[in-house]
Structure formats: structure tokens, C-alpha cells
């Protein structure tokens, strides 16, 4: 049984009575449908009174040339969700744009904010029919922490209050500049850095990787994001074939790369399985996988070594805590994608710190184009890593961040 006891309330889940442990035969689908462990006879005295959504736009000068986007980004959009109770408490979160939520507010108003499993089921159906509204789940977790007087990492299991970060770059620089950036990450204490491929010819990507390895030696773990799992609407380039991915894997083996991320289209499970069997480099995927059963299939199908769903984009914390545990029961790594904004990074950090054993968590940081000030513009204080690369989470109830109300007012567009 896995849960957190906060006096009279329980946040977590119990396996059904006929499944002795989480590793029993047939545990995977059972775990996906695990029932909530909030005591039904001790309902919260709080009720959801309002849900407010606002949209914000931060101008970017200089532009951010993201490796996964063929268009320079001249602004950064973010959506903020606030869930308030009749007692005046408020949970805040950010992530996806909440498209499709309008008209569904009545499904939550008047309900117990601690009925997280109930709200998760509603959000899952909204996801299927309309759009991804998972920031609401994150806001409900922030609110739950404030109601119960505990930080989210503790509600999720309290495994640790901190998680180590890897520096996640976002731009494509020439080999020398890429090596310079890696040296800066090393000096700042990060244990690992993720480099991006997508220069048109993967051989040019390998040249940049060689320059970095030559500069930092074995002092940094190197991760590679191949950027082949999905495309933006205006990018019609085909994903790599299996033979392309295998050829790249051979180069990454030579350069002692820790993992290769999204080397194939996100739906090519057979290709990922074959690639995983053919290479010593860990295969990572799952950042844009939309449904929990698809993540389950990546795990149980032997397709990945590293699973990377983002709580701000799929499943929320309520859904991904299932996936995090299932991943670990299969002796794989669970370390989320976090490229939304500081609130999204923080939510994923709470999830990992609370219940997952992972070597490091993604920390989007590639100045000057992607600075902490840009990434975390919604927050009064940026989320930082210390001189050894550790993110230490707050003891404050909920997520532990506060919105920058003046900045939100100045950047609001809807």
C-alpha cells in the first residue's frame, strides 16, 4: 500500500485486494485503474468555488531559436490556472493552454478539491473529447498541499526533498560554441547536459557532440535529444528511419552518450524495441505521448530504458504517479520532460522527488536565449539549482512557488 498519511486524509492509491504486490502477474493494467485511497468517510470541508484561467505572452528579444522549431520564437506564451475554495485558499499551476476546458467548469465547482481521483477521471474524458487540461490537476495538487499543510513532494511519498538536475539546452550552436556552453554548465555544477540534434544532417550533429566530448571529457554525462518523435504543424520533415537511428546510435556509443531521446517517431514502438535491443545506449521517449495506456505499452513492451512524460502535458500528477511507479517496477528510469515553464518544472520536480529514483531531472536552461528569467517569468522567484546541480524543494504547503502578480498583469493577453 502506498499513501501519505496527513492526519485524517490519504493521498495515494491502494492495489486491489487480489493483487498482493505491484509486481504480481497482471499488475500493469490493475495499477492503471488503482482506486483512490482518500478516506471516503472523511470528506474535506472545502469546496471548489471558482476556476480562473488567464493567458500570458512574454516578448523574446533576442528570439529563441529552438532546435525543434523551424521558426524563431519571438514570444513565449503561458497559461495560468487558479482553483479557489469557498474558504479562500487558492491553488495555482501552469502548463498546456487548457483548450477545451471552457464549458466544463460546472463539473468541478462545488466539489471537494481533495477528490483528486474523481477530478482526474473528468479531466481524462475532457482530454479524450476536447483537449489537454492537465494544469488543472497540478493546481489541485497545489491546493491540496495548502489544505493539508504539506508540500506536494511529501504528499506524494516524501522520498526526498530534492532532485538533481541536468542542464537541458534548446538551441543548435556551432561545435565550438556548443563546447563552450558545456564548459559553463560544468562550472555551474550540473552533472549532465542534454544536447540537441536537428541540424539537417545528423553527421553535423555528431560533429558538435564530438567537440563537446573532446572539451569536457568524462566530467559530464552527455544526453542527446534526436527530436524525431513529433513535429510542429509547419515542419513537414520526415522522422528518421530505423537504419538512420541505428547509425546515430553507433556514433553515440562511441562517444559514451548516456541516452538518446526520441530517435524514432513516437508511434514506432516496434522500431524503438528493435533499436533498444541493438544498442548499448539507453533509449528515451514519451514526452508527447498522450494517453496513460500508451505509456504503459512503452514500458511493458520493452520499448524504452527511460520514460519522459510531462505532468503539465499528460495525466497531471494524479495520472503520472501511477506511471512513475509502474516504470520503476519494471526497473526503468522515470524522469519527466519539463519544457513548459517554471511552474511546470516545479510540479515535475515534486513528482520525482516524492516517489521516484532518478539520476537527474530536466532543467531547461540555455542562456541567453532561454534564461531562468524567461522560463520562470510567471513566478516571483525562479526555480534554481545549487552549485552541485541540486534542486531543493520548499517545505511550504503545495508547490511552494508564488505567482509574480505584477508580471502576470503586464503580460496578460486574455
Predicted regions and their residues:
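Shared catalytic-loop signature of beta/alpha-barrel
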Residues: 110-111, 115-118, 256, 265-284, ...
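Metal-dependent enolase-superfamily TIM-barrel catalytic cores that perform enediolate-based chemistry
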Residues: 162-279
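Aromatic (phenylalanine/tyrosine) cluster motif
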Residues: 3-4, 10-13
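Metal- or metallocofactor-binding catalytic centers and their adjacent structured scaffolds
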Residues: 45, 50-52, 83-148
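Conserved, mostly hydrophobic/aromatic
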Residues: 48, 88, 136, 149, ...
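Flexible C-terminal active-site loop/helix
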Residues: 33, 38, 43-63, 69, ...
